[in-house]
Design a protein with these regions (language model features):
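Transmembrane alpha-helical segments of multipass membrane enzymes and assembly factors
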Residues: 10, 109-113, 134-148
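Start-transfer (signal-anchor) and selected internal transmembrane alpha helices
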Residues: 1-31
Length: 177
């Protein structure tokens, strides 16, 4: 819905039809990414991020303070609370702030996804779509005669189509462009 109504998308120069097509293509790439990693690579980082975010989310039901500490607090300390230690021990990347950021976002998305990985993919693809459209808008200024080529390049290039659509760092990196 946001893609068809938000001026950031509608004023991009890409018609609504092609915006939705691009989003659908990216969704397919994101779903394929999750499926491939769950069936051929034993989950990989993408499923590990999701599973760890579920542990973070479930901490809310043990003690809401734990959840807020995990999602918004610093991870550069050693907790002394035994119950909290029990929660964070299985969470990978606890002390790696760069990777832990992905877990934080996924822990917040857990409230909307009800624990479904593919709902996270829908959000992640939207984040990635923001970057893809922003990149298109920027390139359009410099190359106004190549809009079709840019659309194909940005929505069908394998690295953007597949890697940029999964629940992983690449989608956020694309958004940050």
């Amino acid at each position: 819905y946001a893609i068809t109504k938000c001026s950031f998308f509608t004023k991009s120069g890409i018609t609504t039809k092609y915006l939705l097509l691009g989003y659908g293509i990216k969704l397919f790439g994101g779903f394929a990414y999750g499926y491939i990693y769950s069936h051929w690579y034993s989950g990989g980082d993408t499923w590990e991020y999701f599973d760890c975010s579920k542990l973070m989310h479930d901490a809310f039901y043990v003690n809401p303070r734990y959840y807020f500490q995990l999602v918004f607090g610093s991870c550069n300390y050693t907790p002394t609370d035994a119950e909290f230690l029990k929660i964070i021990t299985p969470i990978a990347h606890w002390s790696d702030e760069r990777t832990y950021f992905i877990l934080r976002i996924n822990a917040i998305l857990q409230w909307f996804s009800f624990g479904n990985y593919y709902v996270h993919t829908v959000f992640w693809v939207f984040f990635s779509m923001l970057g893809t459209v922003a990149f298109y808008r920027t390139l359009k200024v410099y190359f106004p005669n190549y809009t079709i080529f840019m659309y194909v390049l940005l929505f069908l290039q394998p690295s953007i189509f597949f890697w940029g659509s999964g629940v992983h760092k690449d989608g956020l990196t694309l958004m940050a462009l």
